[in-house]
Curated annotation (Swiss-Prot):
Active site annotation, chain numbering: R145, K169, H238, R241, H264, Y273 (o-(3'-phospho-dna)-tyrosine intermediate)
GO molecular function, a single term: tyrosine-based site-specific recombinase activity
All residue ranges annotated as the Core-binding (CB) domain in the record: 1-84
Annotated family: Belongs to the 'phage' integrase family. XerC subfamily.
Domain annotation Tyr recombinase: ranges: 105-286
GO cellular component labels: cytoplasm
Protein name: Tyrosine recombinase XerC
Keyword annotations of the record: Cell cycle, Cell division, Chromosome partition, Cytoplasm, DNA integration, DNA recombination, DNA-binding
Pfam families xref list: Phage_int_SAM_1 (PF02899), Phage_integrase (PF00589)
Protein role: Site-specific tyrosine recombinase, which acts by catalyzing the cutting and rejoining of the recombining DNA molecules. The XerC-XerD complex is essential to convert dimers of the bacterial chromosome into monomers to permit their segregation at cell division. It also contributes to the segregational stability of plasmids.
Domain of life from the UniProt record: Bacteria
Major site of localization recorded for this protein: cytoplasm
SUPFAM superfamilies reported for this sequence: DNA breaking-rejoining enzymes (SSF56349), lambda integrase-like, N-terminal domain (SSF47823)
């Protein structure tokens, strides 16, 4: 990897406070780009617009989703923008490239009865169950990202309100409330889960050895819960984030409030990540449209 690319990644880590997961995506995008340059015998410095178009075609030939192609092009556009600040002779070859349109899709979410089934699966009387329940409760009750979840420290939890302070993207801090079920789960976990009582750190969530749990560890916990839950086949942390937002909107929460809770800068981002179910759309329509129902005579 070129020195300027390493400097770029360090900038994203130090100045923009990107998560390890996001940094890996940027790194992998640059590695793939470098591989293309080697194949085509193109120099990074002399790479130009026609080469950018060829690279776009190359990405599509790999049968990648449009959203993935869009992200990879965005990575390179951002990289060249950074390089231009370091070297006045550099021109961004991706600036004129038409951004691939993203596919429209409805984010996956759990129905309320599916969430209840997940909670019923988690044991209430085992050490592991106490910890796993807190993970599930916090993700569903607050809609926080998994990267935010694993970085919660004991001082971030406020049992009086109750709620949690999280550090989101761009090093932005926000407070997210949670309900009584979540509060009780956290209290029982802190009171009875032995590994956390003997730690030398202040992270809320730990593994069975008392070390801070990782994002990978959280995904393992969720997959284990799903395997034991009838009628539920797939789960990931962001699906719980979608579920959190969807259920709030279905119960009448306004988009601005959900935006604040999710930690989104732009309302349009919230619009992409949240939606109401088809059943709720029909319910609103039937209640609101003057000719939705035919009156009986």
């Amino acid at each position: 990897m070129e020195e300027i690319q390493v400097t770029f990644l360090n900038m994203l880590k130090v100045e923009r406070n990107f998560s390890a997961h996001t940094l890996k995506s940027y790194h992998d995008d640059l590695v793939q780009f470098n591989h293309f340059l080697e194949q085509e015998l193109i120099n990074l410095r002399t790479f130009e617009y026609k080469d950018a178009r060829n690279y776009l075609s190359y990405l599509y030939s790999q049968n990648l989703k449009r959203t993935t192609v869009s992200r990879k092009i965005s990575t390179l556009r951002t990289f060249y923008e950074f390089w231009m600040t370091q070297d006045e002779t550099i021109i961004n070859p991706f600036v004129q490239l038409v951004h691939p349109k993203k596919e429209n899709y409805l984010p996956q979410f759990f129905y309320e009865e599916e969430m209840e089934a997940l909670f019923e699966t988690v044991a209430k009387d085992t050490k592991k169950g106490l910890r796993d329940r807190v993970i599930l409760e916090l993700l569903y009750a607050t809609g926080i990202r998994v990267s935010e979840l694993v970085n919660i420290q004991l001082k971030d939890i406020d049992m009086s309100l109750p709620g949690v302070k999280v550090l989101g993207k761009g090093n932005k801090e926000r407070f997210v409330p949670f309900g009584e079920f979540c509060r009780q789960s956290i209290e029982q976990y802190l009171r009875e889960f032995k590994p956390i009582q003997h730690t030398k750190h202040s992270f809320l969530l730990v593994n069975m050895n008392g070390a801070p749990i990782t994002e990978r560890g959280v995904r393992y916990v969720l997959n284990d819960v799903v395997k034991r839950t009838a009628g539920v086949t797939e789960i990931h942390p962001h699906k719980l984030r979608h579920t959190f937002a969807t259920h709030l909107l279905n119960q009448g929460a306004d988009l601005r409030t959900v935006q604040s809770l999710l930690g989104h800068v732009n309302l349009s981002t919230t619009g992409r990540y949240t939606h109401v179910s088809n059943q709720q759309l029909r319910k609103v329509y039937l209640n609101a449209h003057p000719r939705a129902k035919k009156e009986s005579k």
